[in-house]
């Protein structure tokens, strides 16, 4: 225990409009009081109203559990494979499998552009059925056909009993499956006419103007090659042909087709024309794609949410949703360059002026605005803002990295609603707690509670390879000149293990969060090892006093005082300690590196 420890408790507050769970710190401070707490991240203060999730049908309800038996555990571990057995569409993207080597938590990461495609109802001669074709072709051997698409050399194979039960479940409750089964029956009749399935791309005229349409409106049969009633937004899946149809990120059937185990009832996803319950003041009438997914991905007590609570499949779905939102934004920029005043960036003369003398580089250039996170202009604008601060105040004095700790009590308490769930299953909760802690840490720095009075602060947020967020922060102190001093470094930075007899809490925290390695001969496979040596130059040398090398880099005090800890049964002393601020470490209890800098 530590009296100044940062702690917010569990997410014990709810939005008064949609019942999404929150921490008190996440309130809209300008509109809230202790008696009237306002949240608007989830539903924009009641303006976005969407249907609730329905309970999953059996046996899916019993299988999707984090605290279930052996069948449930095996299903949750292979849930992405099970979903791929029943998906109607292919996920055209490179999935980075190298990230999951080792013993760390599972992470779903993709590279490149996401494409969703659907083929014909009947496979080409000599080809095995796949995706939607499995609902039509050779259904007498359907289970074996589905199992044939699984890599036989994988770590584990889906259970045929579970696959059979899921086939029956989808046949009973999923309207999209029923449409494909109807097409199968038509195609198998002796006098079968040409049959196609229309995936409806526009939905309107559905009862409640605030509710999504019923899933029966997502698909229809076209008999005899008729194209009556087919709009430019619809996708027609023909019975034969080698052409693949791309499905738009805003097609209402997209997610139901790609994730039948998340949406077993075939519920429609985002589509254009979803109205606000209460129109906002900005003049818009329709819910945006981002607002739709933000609403759906908030947990509400007593309401099942497969989009958050399906383990590895939820990870894939959330990445898919984000990529869809990004694709829609990029599409808007592509077709609205005139609104962004981009005419000066187009044309051969402009290309030559920018040095694009190669003919392959000459053509139409599309500009991303500075408001688009990650764009070239976004990065340049923030870089020049920081350089402007440096021109006024000189180089920063302190550099600190604030890293998320997935074992924070707030995260653990947020997982209590789904017993057995782990932090790696809920990236949303991890990031929300991290931002609360980061806001508090930045406030501590700005108010002078960490490094004394400061003149300026700048920071950037990033994500580690495994997905945990962290923030790099640079600080300009008020009480220092342009040259750092030994006294200032020793006042705010320590690179030693505290004495366990005098400060047992400090010793325990440094031991847990601030010890590098072990690496070197004791662990040559450590991630920091490059060309046979540690890229971070550990272990450091013992030093009785802090000093600076000729280039101005600090050489922290690391006394040979006999204080040692063990990590992986390897003794580590002060030479392995990562520089830190002990008071900050005690308050936030995470990996928080602090360095002195002067250039």
Residue spans for each PLM region:
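Non-catalytic interaction regions
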Residues: 1-599
């Amino acid at each position: 225990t530590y009296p100044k420890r940062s702690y917010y408790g569990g997410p014990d507050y709810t939005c008064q409009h949609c019942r999404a769970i929150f921490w008190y710190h996440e309130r809209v401070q300008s509109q809230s009081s202790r008696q009237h707490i306002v949240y608007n991240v989830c539903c924009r203060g009641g303006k976005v109203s969407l249907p609730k999730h329905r309970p999953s049908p059996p046996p899916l309800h019993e299988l999707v559990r984090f605290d279930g038996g052996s069948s449930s555990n095996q299903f949750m571990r292979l849930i992405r494979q099970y979903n791929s057995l029943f998906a109607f569409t292919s996920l055209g993207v490179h999935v980075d499998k190298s990230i999951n080597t080792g013993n760390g938590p599972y992470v779903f990461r993709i590279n490149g552009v996401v494409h969703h495609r659907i083929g014909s109802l009947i496979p080409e001669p000599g080809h095995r059925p796949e995706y939607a074709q499995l609902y039509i072709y050779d259904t007498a051997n359907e289970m074996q056909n589905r199992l044939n698409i699984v890599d036989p050399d994988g770590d584990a194979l889906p259970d045929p009993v579970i696959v059979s039960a899921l086939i029956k479940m989808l046949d009973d409750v999923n309207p999209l499956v029923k449409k494909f089964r109807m097409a199968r029956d038509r195609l198998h009749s002796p006098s079968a006419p040409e049959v196609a399935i229309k995936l409806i791309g526009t939905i309107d005229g559905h009862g409640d103007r605030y509710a999504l349409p019923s899933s029966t409106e997502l698909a229809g049969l076209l008999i005899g090659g008729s194209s009556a009633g087919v709009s430019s937004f619809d996708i027609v899946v023909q019975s034969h042909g080698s052409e693949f149809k791309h499905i738009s990120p805003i097609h209402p059937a997209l997610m139901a087709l790609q994730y039948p185990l998340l949406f077993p009832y075939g519920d429609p996803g985002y589509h254009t024309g979803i109205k606000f319950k209460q129109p906002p003041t900005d003049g818009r009438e329709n819910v945006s794609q981002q607002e739709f997914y933000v609403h759906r991905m908030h947990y509400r007590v007593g309401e099942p949410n497969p989009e958050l609570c399906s383990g590895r499949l939820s990870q894939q779905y959330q990445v898919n949703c984000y990529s869809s939102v990004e694709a829609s934004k990029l599409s808007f920029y592509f077709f609205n360059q005139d609104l962004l005043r981009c005419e000066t960036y187009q044309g051969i003369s402009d290309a030559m002026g920018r040095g694009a003398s190669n003919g392959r580089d000459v053509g139409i250039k599309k500009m991303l605005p500075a408001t688009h996170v990650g764009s070239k202009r976004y990065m340049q604008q923030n870089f020049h803002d920081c350089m402007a601060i440096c021109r006024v105040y000189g180089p920063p004095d302190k550099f600190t990295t604030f890293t998320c700790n997935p074992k924070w009590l707030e995260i653990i308490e947020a997982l209590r609603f789904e017993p057995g769930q782990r932090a790696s299953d809920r990236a949303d909760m991890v990031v929300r707690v991290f931002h609360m802690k980061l806001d508090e840490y930045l406030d501590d720095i700005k108010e002078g509670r960490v490094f004394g009075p400061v003149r300026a602060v700048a920071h950037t947020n990033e994500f580690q390879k495994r997905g945990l967020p962290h923030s790099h922060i640079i600080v300009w102190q008020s009480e220092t000149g342009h040259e750092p001093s030994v006294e200032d470094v020793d006042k705010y930075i320590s690179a030693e293990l505290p004495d366990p007899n005098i400060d047992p809490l400090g010793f325990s925290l440094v031991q847990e969060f601030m010890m590098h390695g072990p690496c070197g001969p004791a662990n040559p496979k450590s991630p920091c090892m490059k060309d046979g040596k540690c890229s971070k130059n550990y272990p450091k040398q013992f030093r009785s006093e802090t000093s600076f090398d000729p280039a101005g880099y600090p050489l922290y005090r690391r006394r040979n005082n006999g204080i040692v800890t063990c990590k992986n049964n390897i003794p580590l002393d002060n030479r392995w300690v990562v520089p830190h601020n002990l008071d900050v470490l005690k308050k936030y209890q995470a990996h928080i590196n602090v360095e002195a800098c002067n250039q």
